[in-house]
Amino acid sequence: MLKIYNSLSNKIEEFKPIHEKKVNMYVCGPTVYDDIHIGNGRPVVFFDVVKRYLQYLDYGVKYASNITDVDDKIIDRAQKLHITEKELATTYTNNFFEIAKKIGGYNFDVTPHATNYIEEMIKFIGELISDGFAYKTQSGVYFRVDKIKDYGILSNQQVKDLKTGVRIDLETDKEKDYDFALWKNTEEGIKYHAPWGDGRPGWHTECVVMTNEIFGGEIDIHGGGFDLKFPHHENEIAQSVAKHDHHLAKYWMHVGRLDLANEKMSKSLGNDIKLKDLVQVYNPNAYRLMLLAHHYRAPIQFSDDLIEQYQKAYDKISYTLNKWHFHMILNNINENGLDHESMEYFEGFMNDDFATPRVISLIDKLIKDLNKAFKVENYNTIIQILSTLGINPNILEVLEDDIQNYNNWQQARLEKNYEKADIYRKPLLDKGFI
């Protein structure tokens, strides 16, 4: 029985999707004005694992993750680079997809782009105005937060205590400081025509509209980074309640930050490490292993020592699996049985709010056991668990030359011709087969 921590209730709950054996999941994706940093990659990896494990449990999963390709940051960056917003957004969208594939996280079924849903956003905003949940001003359209009785339910705040967030504009013509923008009238950058003025949609409206357009109603899981809980996700809930009289999602899942030297990593602060740069130095599987060795809700303090630790751990896994794969080929072992006790442990850990650190410890134990005494069930179990975690060690193909080198090596050893034996042994060592 899968149990997950629901940020909406602040407690562990049994996972019961709205429709039996079918899961709809939406995760907030990047604003494509720059390459993602190593902290941005954490939700990409985690929710990929969520989808993989749900599929392992025989759920059908539809997974959407958006691309925010209209935003003030995109406009500012494009102007500085003297290119169009579309050119900038296209470049960094392609870069994001490329790095997501490299870290094994390109497991999306739908990747909606905000610019493809502008008409739907304008219609949505117009209906909120008609229903009294939004109002027009000279600067744009704003949402009346006071109209939502349980506003603050996700972030555990009361309206009277609200502080405006980073992405809430402090416009002087708002009714209340904490009202948030649905539409921003502007003369600068890319803009669209709407009945209340030319401009562009607010960030919070983009996601709620795309979620509704793709799934047509309440979804099972809405996810993202912990820093999106407020104001972004709170404001998505408010709009959904106003328009549809129900919450946007049944379960909300938030991933902890990855910080650099105890400081929040941020592109705007200029203290970020680009993920594309990290995986040029370290194996993408080592990055993934590092993330999964920490519980998804816990913060991670990144350092060179930390990633190097998991590079070594991954190298050990890869070497062990290659060595025993070669052994299986040599001895014509092709059984596909699993160690059922270990698989029960695996499922128990994953069912406990995706306790991946305990799964990584289980893998470490199985690797140690395998190196003590070969059991094909242990080998197959490690492969199965790693696959479900999206970690794919580079298992090398065993060629006829490799088998011949092994046989020649053994023969030379029998003949006590150690110089000749070393010649045949070296290519096997280079491949990690012995």
Swiss-Prot record:
Subcellular location: Cytoplasm
Positions contributing to Zn(2+) binding: C28, C207, H232, E236
Catalysed transformations (reactions): tRNA(Cys) + L-cysteine + ATP = L-cysteinyl-tRNA(Cys) + AMP + diphosphate
Residues binding ATP: K267
Record bears the keyword Metal-binding: yes
Cofactor(s) needed for function: Zn(2+)
Principal location: cytoplasm
Alphabetized UniProt keyword annotations: Aminoacyl-tRNA synthetase, ATP-binding, Cytoplasm, Ligase, Metal-binding, Nucleotide-binding, Protein biosynthesis, Zinc
Gene Ontology MF: a single term: zinc ion binding
Its EC number(s): 6.1.1.16
Assembly, per entry: Monomer.
Family assignment from sequence similarity: Belongs to the class-I aminoacyl-tRNA synthetase family.
Matches recorded under NCBIfam families: cysS (TIGR00435)
HAMAP family according to UniProt: Cys_tRNA_synth (MF_00041)
UniProt protein name: Cysteine--tRNA ligase
Species of the source: Acholeplasma laidlawii (strain PG-8A)
